[in-house]
Regions:
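Extreme N-terminal leader/targeting segments of oxidoreductases
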Residues: 7-28, 46-48
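Phosphate-coordination loops involved in phosphoryl transfer and adenosine-cofactor binding
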Residues: 25, 121, 154
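Short coil/turn connectors at secondary-structure junctions
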Residues: 25-26, 47-49, 60, 147, ...
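N-terminal Rossmann-like FAD-binding beta1-loop-alpha1 element of flavoenzymes
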Residues: 26-53
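Residue-level detector of alpha-helix initiation sites
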Residues: 30, 34-36, 59, 189-191
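Conserved N-terminal/central alpha/beta ligand/cofactor-binding core
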Residues: 56-150
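Predominantly flavin-linked oxidoreductase catalytic cores and closely associated redox partners
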Residues: 134-135, 139-194
């Protein structure tokens, strides 16, 4: 399968979006530029936080573009959270807490409110009407860009520690150390064959 990377996905290289500053103290540093990382960063920035995403790849959302055969199965439209979680073996306790905070309806409303219509297919699977994962990525990158989230790509994190004196996080990459009040690890999981 060929994956097309849109100009939006490469826009983190733009000077106003990409950062090389290492001496700033960030409110939030998010490790991982996948969907969870971008949602976390966008939500934090919406609340007025100064946010940095550290991404190991050159572009954000790289694995997102191949999910669902390149179509991106956003969610499962089973209205009852407990029923939906039957489809996720072994992780239901953790996921129940997460889905109780941001439900399937919240997910659908979020994308609809950002101009991305969805459709439901067999088994309650929900996809963008465009049948393109790129549509999902464009929404997420558009939000973090609008909220002035900064991104440092090609920056795999090598260590995270807490300074005992200041209580601040020290997040190290190969080339720099970033300091933050909060650190969110949103590195995602391994890809699986469909």
């Amino acid at each position: 399968m060929r994956v097309r990377v849109s100009p939006w996905a490469l826009s983190e290289m733009d000077s106003e979006f990409q950062t090389n500053k290492t001496n700033d103290i960030w409110d939030v540093v998010v490790i991982g530029g996948g969907p969870a990382g971008m949602m976390t960063a966008g939500g934090s920035a919406t609340r007025g936080r100064k946010v940095l995403i550290l991404e190991k790849n050159e572009t954000l959302g790289k694995k997102l573009l191949i999910t669902g055969g390149g179509r991106c199965n956003l969610t499962n439209n089973k209205v009852d959270t407990r029923e939906m979680l039957l489809h996720y073996k072994g992780e239901s306790d953790f996921l129940f807490s997460a889905f109780s905070q941001f439900s399937v309806k919240d997910t659908l409303d979020f994308f609809h409110n950002h101009g991305m219509p969805t459709k439901e297919e067999s088994g309650g699977r929900v996809f963008p009407v465009s049948d393109r994962a790129q549509s999902v990525l464009d929404v997420l990158i558009g939000i973090i860009r609008e909220k002035s989230v900064k991104v440092r790509s090609n920056s795999p994190v090598t260590d995270v520690s807490i300074d005992k004196t200041t209580g601040l996080f020290n997040i190290k990459t190969k080339g720099a150390t970033f300091i933050a009040h909060s650190c969110v690890i949103a590195t995602g999981g391994t890809s699986r064959k469909e």
